[in-house]
Amino acid sequence: MEVDINGDSRSTLTTLPLPVAEGSSPGKAEAEKPRCSSTPCSPMRRTVSGYQILHMDSNYLVGFTTGEELLKLAQKCTGGEDSKGEAMPALRAKQLDTGLARSSRLYKTRSRYYQPYEIPAVNGRRRRRMPSSGDKCTKPLPYEPYKALHGPLPLCLLKGKRAHSKSLDYLNLDKMNIKEPADTEVLQYQLQHLTLRGDRVFARNNT
């Protein structure tokens, strides 16, 4: 017996269509892979086709239940035919409650993976993940001497000088006026004169 997300039962199908979903999913296998290798606990797994999604919140955290649990709930519900009218709202509320509880529990257990975490040491070196735009990182860095005393500089100060930052968040590429043609022209001019000077030196040495 299959149950909707809202809890409405569909009595037309007695079993979950697992082989059909597994057989006709060549493109679905790629979509069920984890979105990023840095999230070790991704809810997208290969067994999603055999699961019933109960609840999904805005963070794409999903509360699952297996087909066996749904069949047990259906057998409990259909065991008393006379009390079917009272059992259906209770079943619906119970499923929604379990979905909410499971999704919140998933969020609690996985919330630590959203903060910067230490990558395991490789060859004795300790590497750290690049801080994202939401992280507060005000450590004095060797390649950013102006950030030692204060936080990230505002946009008006960054427009005049080049931002020597490895993070693209400080570049503000959508708001900057990029003057690439002038730079390329100057570089081409300098390169041309350098090559001419080099040719003269080599010609002078050859003669």
From Swiss-Prot:
Residues that bear N-acetylmethionine: M1
UniProt keyword Transport, yes or no: yes
Location of the region described as Disordered in the Swiss-Prot/TrEMBL record: 1-41
GO BP annotation list: cilium assembly; epithelial cell migration; fibroblast migration; inflammatory response; negative regulation of cytokine production involved in inflammatory response; negative regulation of epithelial cell migration; negative regulation of fibroblast migration; negative regulation of inflammatory response
Tissue expr: Highly expressed in photoreceptors.
Subcellular location: Cytoplasm; Cell projection, Cilium
Record has Cell division as a keyword: no
Main subcellular localisation: cytoplasm
Entry's Gene Ontology cellular component terms: ciliary transition zone; cytoplasm
Keywords: Acetylation, Cell projection, Cilium, Cilium biogenesis/degradation, Cytoplasm, Inflammatory response, Phosphoprotein, Protein transport, Transport
Phosphoserine modification, residue list: S25, S167
Family: Belongs to the UNC119-binding protein family.
Job description of the protein: Regulates the macrophage function, by enhancing the resolution of inflammation and wound repair functions mediated by M2 macrophages. The regulation of macrophage function is, due at least in part, to its ability to inhibit glycolysis. May also play a role in trafficking of proteins via its interaction with UNC119 and UNC119B cargo adapters: may help the release of UNC119 and UNC119B cargo or the recycling of UNC119 and UNC119B. May play a role in ciliary membrane localization via its interaction with UNC119B and protein transport into photoreceptor cells.
Subunit structure: Interacts with UNC119 and UNC119B; interaction preferentially takes place when UNC119 and UNC119B are unliganded with myristoylated proteins.
Protein name: Macrophage immunometabolism regulator
Organism per entry: Mus musculus (Mouse)
Taxonomic placement: Eukaryota, Metazoa, Chordata, Craniata, Vertebrata
